[in-house]
UniProtKB/Swiss-Prot annotation:
This is Small ribosomal subunit protein uS13. It comes from the Bacteria. Part of the 30S ribosomal subunit. Forms a loose heterodimer with protein S19. Forms two bridges to the 50S subunit in the 70S ribosome. Residues 95-123 are annotated as: Disordered. One of its GO terms (cellular component) is small ribosomal subunit. The keyword Cytoplasm does not apply. Keywords: Ribonucleoprotein, Ribosomal protein, RNA-binding, rRNA-binding, tRNA-binding. HAMAP family: Ribosomal_uS13. Belongs to the universal ribosomal protein uS13 family. It comes from Clostridium acetobutylicum (strain ATCC 824 / DSM 792 / JCM 1419 / IAM 19013 / LMG 5710 / NBRC 13948 / NRRL B-527 / VKM B-1787 / 2291 / W). PROSITE patterns: RIBOSOMAL_S13_1, RIBOSOMAL_S13_2.
């Protein structure tokens, strides 16, 4: 069982895909890591040697901000935007889309479920 950055990588997957289970490492970063550590990308996680796992772990720790550190940094960035009261911070505070999307009809993901409005009765 390969354990990198506190994450158990899935045994049956290829190393290239297994590394993407770590928060902060996508497919492009995964391929870059594998190339730098000269590990065969077709190798399954269960077939990695201890030296290969250590090489991957060392390279990731030196060159990438992952898991808790990355989550903390993102949270602090959002908190900073909210505190300075800029447009993006206000959108975060109100729970609305931050990147300029229209909100008249869509944006349900950010706004949450629809809120019922009482209908007017006709006379």
């Amino acid at each position: 069982m390969a354990r990198i950055a506190g994450i158990d990588l899935p045994k049956e997957k290829r190393v290239e895909i297994g590394l993407t289970y770590i928060y902060g490492i996508g497919l492009t970063s995964s391929r870059k890591i594998i190339k730098a550590t000269s590990v065969n990308p077709e190798t399954r996680v269960k077939d990695l040697t201890e030296e290969e796992v250590n090489a991957l772990r060392d390279y990731i720790n030196k060159n990438f901000k992952i898991e808790g550190d990355l989550r903390r940094e993102v949270a602090l960035n959002i908190k900073r935007l909210v505190e300075i009261g800029c447009y993006r911070g206000i959108r975060h505070r109100r729970g609305l889309p931050v990147r300029g999307q229209k909100t008249k009809t869509n944006a349900r993901t950010r706004k949450g479920p629809k809120k019922a409005v009482a209908s007017k009765k006709k006379k």
